[in-house]
Regions:
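Bacterial Sec-dependent N-terminal signal peptides
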Residues: 1-18, 22
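Extracellular interaction modules
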Residues: 10, 287-288
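Intrinsic disorder/low-complexity segments in short proteins, especially the signal peptide
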Residues: 22-24, 133
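Sec/Tat signal peptide C-region and signal peptidase I cleavage site
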Residues: 25-29
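The right-handed parallel beta-helix/beta-solenoid scaffold, focusing on the short coil/turn
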Residues: 30, 36-43, 48-50, 55-60, ...
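Surface-exposed intrinsically disordered loops and tails
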Residues: 70-72
Length: 344
């Protein structure tokens, strides 16, 4: 894994530096060390060169470190930001790798054309273009990352991404399988904005909070999603997924699939809540003009302009259908006190 490689390389670098210090033997020609208090501006890393940064490195271009692929343990080379080290305005391009270790900081990095950043420290204002990737490992924090077309951010368990802007991942259509573009979350993602064509996938162990989704963007929930606002965007809650405090505004959909659950959803005018058979939505607030699409094989409990309503155990009571709303009453099931209004 990227994390294993980072840790392994960190040990190797430390041993090499310690040996050089003790024996007064200079580092290998391919290893460029930026000492604490030193600043290096511009330069290029190629052909398995290493830059080991304890001080400050600005404007570097990195084109080595991933020649054997992102999953190969045989990779060497790249830029290594150590504890206290700082890298600014770096470009990581084809086959390039930037490793930000615990206590290290990278800012204003552009990663493109298959380059990657392995993060156990802090990364600020990273831009991912055209197969550029960022791997946020345990203890790593990425803030202000922008994920453009075919870019990919993976937030591992124990990692944190905050203020991410996602512009890719859903080009194949809503809830399609674009596994390695957009954002995939096993750790925590906070204050994310998902724009047209953007996708956030929250895996079983993942948590997303305070997410804003615009038209053409979507969120796939297999873990937990808290405080999501759908401004025309879509949220899909899969089996074992949980979404709490979702607000559905005009053009937005929340889709709760079999085995998924939603709590405290608010449906505003021209927003839509869809609950599939075997799905569950409780504490729903259906405001005037909001649509509910479900069947008596689902569980939906909440309030609407008539008062309390329920759909559970094959019985529906007090449901309001409008603005595209629909209730399918299955064989041997029942519905009472249903109001079918404009567009229902």
């Amino acid at each position: 894994s990227e994390l294993a490689r980072s840790r392994g390389k960190r040990v190797g670098v430390a041993v090499a530096l310690s040996l050089a210090a003790v024996t007064s033997v200079p580092a290998l020609a391919a290893d460029k060390v930026v000492q604490a208090g030193e600043t290096v501006n511009d330069g290029t890393l190629t052909n398995h060169d290493n830059q080991i940064v304890f001080g400050t490195a600005n404007g570097m271009t990195i084109s080595t470190g991933l020649e054997l692929g992102p999953d190969s343990e045989e990779n060497t080379g790249g830029q290594w930001i150590q504890n206290g080290g700082i890298a600014g305005n770096t470009t990581v391009t084809t086959n390039g790798r930037q490793v930000v270790l615990e206590g290290g900081t990278a800012s204003d990095t552009v990663i493109r054309d298959g380059g990657g950043q392995s993060l156990n420290g802090l990364a600020v204002n990273t831009t991912l273009n055209n197969r550029g990737e960022q791997w946020v490992h345990e203890g790593g924090v990425a803030t202000g990352t922008i994920i453009n077309r075919d870019g990919y951010q993976s937030v591992k368990s124990g990692g944190l991404a905050t203020g991410t802007i996602i512009n890719t991942g859903a080009e194949g259509g809503p809830d399609s399988d674009n596994s390695y573009t957009g954002q995939k979350v096993q750790g925590t993602a906070e204050s994310t904005t998902i724009n047209k064509n953007g996708r956030q996938i929250i895996l079983f162990s993942g948590l997303a909070r305070d997410t804003l989704i615009y038209a053409g963007g979507d969120q796939s929930v297999h873990g937990r999603a808290l405080n999501t606002t759908l401004n025309g965007g879509y949220q899909y809650v899969h089996r074992d997924g949980l979404a709490l405090n979702t607000v559905i505004n005009e053009g937005g959909w929340q889709v709760v699939k079999a085995g998924g659950a939603a709590g405290n959803t608010t449906i505003n005018q021209n927003g839509e809540l869809r609950v599939h058979a075997g799905g569950e939505a409780t504490a729903v607030t259906q405001n005037t003009g909001g649509a509910l699409v479900t069947s008596t094989a689902a569980t939906v409990i909440g309030t609407n302009r008539l008062g309390n309503f329920t759909v559970e155990n094959g019985k529906a009571d007090g449901v309001v259908l409008e603005s595209g709303g629909r209730l399918d009453v299955l064989e041997s099931h029942s519905a009472q006190n249903t109001l079918v209004d404009d567009g229902g």
